[in-house]
């Protein structure tokens, strides 16, 4: 018999990870919405971006103007969607939400733009995935609040100009480098979201535990925060799984001991690594002598797709200094050897830190 929770909906091992930064199901997305802060005062972390937005939003409200267009970029799970909702709420306007892949044709975007009210916010997630033809009609909308649309077909077709209400576009992306220069240049406010500190995540866990009515002491919240990989989405997911464990194996309260046992059951170690992380490091170290090793060889060794390794598993290991990408392939660092309890090689030690 197999068991699936709301967090384990896909057949791919990487997609089923409890430490995945992607929302796993509509049910999880609904829970995320319930846990979202409603205003900047409740928003934890991203101090620089929060301070800037407080000023820009306050100024726009005083002038009764639309806020400048906003680009939010950074790794997944850090709160770009949450921040877009907060911006709209702070401005006191409506929010219309869509995503780049959904806007397949110019008419799809035109239908949304023409229905926006004055100073409304349009949030486009994965904006780097807009098609070029859709992006083209977005330019005059952002600059002049106008769009040109074609009426009719064939020789009788003609272009008409439609005036739009002033609005704010919030674009979110995990890959800012994939944005075209003309699109990037049209954002007046650009904010990079960074990974959260353990202290910030502990505050988020404490707040979410309160909303979920789960008694959680400081040490228990801190234990969850330390294993959340700097990402609020993961912190809230781990909190819910630890809550389940506490209610079945304990008295319903979350302390450090209960959190540690629950996370050990989930195979999430003190560094926030799961089975897939350790599997990759073990393959590089034990099967390929620490590297360098090509991506395809690693993929074959652990039975995972190359794209999944590159986009889903590797980034956190690289960011934490356990793995390096070099022109010759992947190399395990000394930290990776220590984490697995293996002595680093002495003869090729210099390769561990090659760039």
Curated annotation (Swiss-Prot):
A GO BP entry: DNA recombination
Annotated keywords: ATP-binding, Cytoplasm, DNA damage, DNA recombination, DNA repair, DNA-binding, Hydrolase, Nucleotide-binding
Disulphide bond pairs: none
Molecular functions per Gene Ontology: ATP binding; ATP hydrolysis activity; four-way junction DNA binding; four-way junction helicase activity
Chain sites annotated for binding Mg(2+): 81
Binding sites annotated in the UniProt record for DNA: 325, 330
Amino acid composition bias (Low complexity), ranges on this chain: 9-22
GO cellular component, one term: cytoplasm
SUPFAM superfamilies from the UniProt entry: P-loop containing nucleoside triphosphate hydrolases (SSF52540), Winged helix' DNA-binding domain (SSF46785)
Positions annotated to bind ATP: 35-36, 77, 80-82, 143-145, 186, 196, 233
Region annotated Small ATPAse domain (RuvB-S), chain positions: 197-267
Intracellular or extracellular location(s): Cytoplasm
Chain segments carrying region Disordered: 1-26
Span list, region Large ATPase domain (RuvB-L): 5-196
InterPro entries membership: AAA+_ATPase, AAA_lid_4, DNA_helicase_Holl-junc_RuvB, P-loop_NTPase, RuvB-like_N, RuvB_C, WH-like_DNA-bd_sf, WH_DNA-bd_sf
Start and end residues of each stretch annotated as Head domain (RuvB-H): 270-355
EC number: 3.6.4.-
UniProt entry tagged with the keyword Repressor: no
Enzyme class at the top of the EC tree: hydrolase
Reactions it catalyzes: ATP + H2O = ADP + phosphate + H(+)
Similarity remark: Belongs to the RuvB family.
Biological role stated in the UniProt entry: The RuvA-RuvB-RuvC complex processes Holliday junction (HJ) DNA during genetic recombination and DNA repair, while the RuvA-RuvB complex plays an important role in the rescue of blocked DNA replication forks via replication fork reversal (RFR). RuvA specifically binds to HJ cruciform DNA, conferring on it an open structure. The RuvB hexamer acts as an ATP-dependent pump, pulling dsDNA into and through the RuvAB complex. RuvB forms 2 homohexamers on either side of HJ DNA bound by 1 or 2 RuvA tetramers; 4 subunits per hexamer contact DNA at a time.
Domain observations: Has 3 domains, the large (RuvB-L) and small ATPase (RuvB-S) domains and the C-terminal head (RuvB-H) domain. The head domain binds DNA, while the ATPase domains jointly bind ATP, ADP or are empty depending on the state of the subunit in the translocation cycle. During a single DNA translocation step the structure of each domain remains the same, but their relative positions change.
The protein's name in its UniProt record: Holliday junction branch migration complex subunit RuvB
Organism: Methylibium petroleiphilum (strain ATCC BAA-1232 / LMG 22953 / PM1)
Lineage of the species this protein comes from: Bacteria, Pseudomonadati, Pseudomonadota, Betaproteobacteria, Burkholderiales
């Amino acid at each position: 018999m197999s068991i699936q929770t709301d967090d384990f909906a896909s057949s791919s091992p990487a997609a089923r990870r409890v430490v995945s930064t992607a929302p796993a199901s509509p049910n999880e997305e609904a829970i995320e919405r319930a846990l979202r802060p409603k205003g900047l005062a409740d928003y934890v972390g991203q101090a620089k971006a929060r301070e800037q937005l407080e000023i820009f939003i306050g100024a726009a409200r005083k002038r009764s103007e639309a806020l400048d267009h906003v680009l939010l970029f950074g790794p997944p799970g850090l709160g770009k969607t949450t921040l877009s909702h907060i911006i709209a709420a702070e401005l006191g306007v409506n929010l219309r939400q869509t995503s780049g892949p959904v806007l397949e044709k110019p008419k799809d975007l035109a239908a949304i733009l023409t229905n926006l009210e004055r100073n409304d916010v349009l949030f486009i997630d994965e904006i780097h995935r807009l098609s070029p033809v859709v992006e083209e009609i977005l330019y005059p909308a952002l600059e002049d609040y106008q769009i040109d649309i074609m009426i009719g077909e064939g020789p009788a077709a003609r272009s008409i100009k439609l005036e739009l209400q002033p609005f704010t576009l919030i674009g979110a992306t995990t890959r800012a480098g994939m944005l075209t220069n003309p699109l990037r240049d049209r954002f007046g406010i650009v904010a990079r979201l960074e990974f959260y500190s353990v202290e910030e995540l502990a505050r988020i866990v404490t707040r979410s535990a309160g909303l979920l009515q789960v008694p959680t002491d400081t040490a228990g919240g801190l234990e969850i925060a330390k294993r959340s990989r700097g990402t609020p989405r993961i912190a809230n997911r781990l909190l819910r799984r630890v809550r389940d464990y506490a209610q079945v194996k304990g008295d319903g309260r979350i302390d450090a001991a209960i959190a540690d046992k629950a996370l050990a059951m989930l195979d999430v170690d003190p560094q926030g690594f799961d089975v897939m992380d350790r599997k990759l490091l073990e393959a590089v170290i034990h099967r390929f002598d620490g590297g360098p090793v090509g991506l395809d060889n690693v993929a074959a060794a652990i039975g995972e797709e190359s794209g999944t390794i590159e986009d889903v598993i590797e980034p956190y290991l690289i960011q934490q200094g356990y793995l390096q990408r070099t022109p010759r392939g992947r190399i395990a660092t000394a930290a990776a050897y220590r984490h697995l309890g293996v002595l680093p090689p002495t003869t090729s030690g210099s390769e561990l830190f090659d760039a």
